[in-house]
From Swiss-Prot:
Residue numbers carrying 4-aspartylphosphate: 63
Subcellular location: Nucleus
InterPro entries: ARR-like (IPR045279), CheY-like_superfamily (IPR011006), Homeodomain-like_sf (IPR009057), Myb_dom_plants (IPR006447), Response_reg_B-typ_pln (IPR017053), SANT/Myb (IPR001005), Sig_transdc_resp-reg_receiver (IPR001789)
Protein name (database record): Two-component response regulator ARR11
Gene name as annotated: ARR11
Domain of life: Eukaryota
Function: Transcriptional activator that binds specifically to the DNA sequence 5'-[AG]GATT-3'. Functions as a response regulator involved in His-to-Asp phosphorelay signal transduction system. Phosphorylation of the Asp residue in the receiver domain activates the ability of the protein to promote the transcription of target genes. Could directly activate some type-A response regulators in response to cytokinins.
GO cellular component, one term: nucleus
UniProt PTM comment: Two-component system major event consists of a His-to-Asp phosphorelay between a sensor histidine kinase (HK) and a response regulator (RR). In plants, the His-to-Asp phosphorelay involves an additional intermediate named Histidine-containing phosphotransfer protein (HPt). This multistep phosphorelay consists of a His-Asp-His-Asp sequential transfer of a phosphate group between first a His and an Asp of the HK protein, followed by the transfer to a conserved His of the HPt protein and finally the transfer to an Asp in the receiver domain of the RR protein.
Binding region for DNA: 195-246
UniProt-listed SMART domains: REC
GO MF annotation, one: DNA-binding transcription factor activity
UniProt record similarity statement: Belongs to the ARR family. Type-B subfamily.
Organism: Arabidopsis thaliana (Mouse-ear cress)
Motif Nuclear localization signal: positions: 192-195
Length: 521
């Protein structure tokens, strides 16, 4: 800035540091800023140079930690003898050291590593020092002139010596320049306004006035000032305080919204499934397992609990099962679903045993093909699994000391199938009306006399297929005594020696009642 007689270019800087590496780095950086640099490794040597050339340096940059003299001691000597601006620097930025440097008269405190941007503006300290001297001599009362000169010279220096346009800030420069020109006129000197301190009583009056008017756009500074009735308070003071008060209220509203939102998220985390799990755990029920039979294998077991905790056998249709807290219901189904049948189950699902097929033994002297006894039967292994002979063990274990739970909770209400047992069968409902009795008997390798008519069999016998069993039951001719008939068969077929899925111990110990007209032509 040539008009004021000061230019940042060629600023004379004395750098004091005991580290030669940092001396070289700072020397290169300062020279890039077009400064004249002098380096020194000892504080006493730097003090000697300053005394010899009192007007030879504009600013001093010194390290705090020096081997021969403390950096703060050097700062005191320079401030008392030469009155030059001194910048202190160090590796650590402890608050105590920074405050000590400011108290001893340091104009700035830099931390290593020092940036180029910080070195480019050290000339401002020199300019402020000179302006302060001018104000002290001429009695200049305007304090904004130094700031304006600082900003203008900084823009001039960083812009390469060219004028830099600041847009709207240019008006501020013109205004401050005009004030500098009128500094010699006492009447034109501006006085700084006193800052208003909002005490508790004053703020209480302000809040009451706002509440009377309403905290909205209608609450203007003029109305509030009239209601407060404070003589020395201005409209600008009320407007500034009103703006801060509205910002405070908006922050409170945002805080409430965040609390409400966080509370809503926490309540939404509890899903209906959790409620269902809790209620299912507290109120156990009782039911039985039901299995659907058919030719197709299990298609899919959906959503099985990965941690099986209870086990139960299917031998008892109404078995009590101890169930842990469950998260999802288990459903086992077949495609296509056929009739339901209940059977005993002891083997696990993954172990499907080989099916044993019994071959009947043919007797030449009997017109009926007799089924062999278990000791006489020959079995053939079949690799195809049979659902009627598979025995299952669901992956649940019964914990000790648990509560009884109804197993019907495994099935959805619409998927529950009534259980059918031998005692619940209705003979009239299980009749095979569409089959010829003769064809059925021939398929079982039964030999019939040639003179026998199949019509009589259909009319006399009321044959019923018991589901889940392997024989026909004559349900029509019941409660009739034929024990005195001499025409009873001498040999009773072995397959008729089964009753209720259990084989009789000895066929000779029991007398069977057979219709005399069963095999008479």
């Amino acid at each position: 800035m040539e008009k004021s007689g000061f230019s940042p270019v060629g600023l004379r800087v004395l750098v004091v540091d005991d580290d030669p590496t940092w001396l070289k780095i700072l020397e290169k950086m300062l020279k890039k800023c077009s400064y004249e640099v002098t380096t020194c490794g000892l504080a006493r040597e730097a003090l000697r140079l300053l005394r010899e050339r009192k007007d030879g340096y504009d600013i001093v940059i010194s390290d705090v930690n020096m081997p021969d003299m403390d950096g703060f001691k050097l700062l005191e000597h320079v401030g008392l003898e030469l009155d030059l601006p001194v910048i202190m620097m160090s590796v650590d930025g402890e608050t105590s050291r920074v405050m000590k440097g400011v108290q001893h008269g340091a104009c700035d405190y830099l931390l290593k590593p020092i940036r180029m941007k910080e070195l480019k503006i050290i000339w401002q300290h020199v300019l402020r020092k000179k302006l302060q001297e001018v104000r002290d001599i001429e009695g200049c009362g305007y304090e904004g002139g130094a700031d304006w000169i600082t900003r203008y010279d900084e823009a001039h220096f960083l812009g390469g010596g060219e004028d830099v346009s600041f847009g709207k800030k240019r008006k501020d420069f013109d205004f401050e320049k005009k004030l500098l020109q009128d500094e010699s006129d006492p009447s034109s000197s501006s006085s700084k306004k006193a800052r208003v301190v909002w005490s508790f009583e004053l703020h209480h009056k302000f809040v009451n006035a706002v509440n009377q008017i309403g905290c909205d756009h209608k609450a203007g500074p003029k109305k509030i000032l009239d209601l407060m009735n404070v003589p020395w308070l201005t409209r600008e003071n009320v407007a500034s305080h009103l703006q801060k008060y509205r910002l405070y209220l908006s922050r409170l509203e945002k805080g409430k919204e965040l609390k409400c939102y966080s509370g809503g998220v926490k309540n939404a985390d509890s899903s209906p499934k959790d409620v269902e799990v809790n209620s299912g755990y507290q109120s156990p029920g009782r039911s039985s397992y039901v299995f659907s039979g058919g030719n197709s294998l299990i298609q899919k077991a959906t959503e099985i609990d990965p941690k099986p905790l209870a086990s139960a056998s299917l031998s008892d249709l109404n078995t009590d099962v101890i169930m842990p807290p469950k998260t999802k219901k288990t459903r086992i189904g077949f495609d296509p679903p056929i009739s339901s049948s209940a059977f005993d189950s002891l083997l696990p699902w993954n172990d499907v045993p080989e099916v044993l097929e019994s071959k009947p033994v043919l007797y030449e002297n009997s017109f009926l093909q007799q089924q062999p006894l278990p000791s006489q039967s020959s079995y053939v292994a079949n690799s195809a699994p049979s659902l009627m002979e598979e025995e299952m063990k669901p992956p649940y274990e019964t914990p000790a000391g648990g509560s009884s739970v109804n197993a019907d909770e495994f099935l959805m209400p619409q998927d529950k199938i009534p259980t059918v047992t031998l005692q619940d069968l209705d003979p009239s409902a299980m009749k095979l009306q569409e089959f010829n009795t003769e064809a059925i008997l021939r398929s079982l390798n039964w030999e019939l006399p040639e003179s026998h008519h199949s019509v009589s069999l259909d009319t006399d016998l009321d044959l019923t297929w018991l589901q889940g069993e392997r024989f026909l039951a004559n349900t029509g001719l019941q409660f009739q005594d034929y024990s005195s008939s001499p025409s009873l068969l001498s040999e009773l077929p072995a397959h008729l020696n089964w009753y209720g899925n259990e084989r009789l111990p000895d066929p000779d110990e029991y007398s069977f009642m057979v219709d005399q007209g069963l095999f008479i032509s």
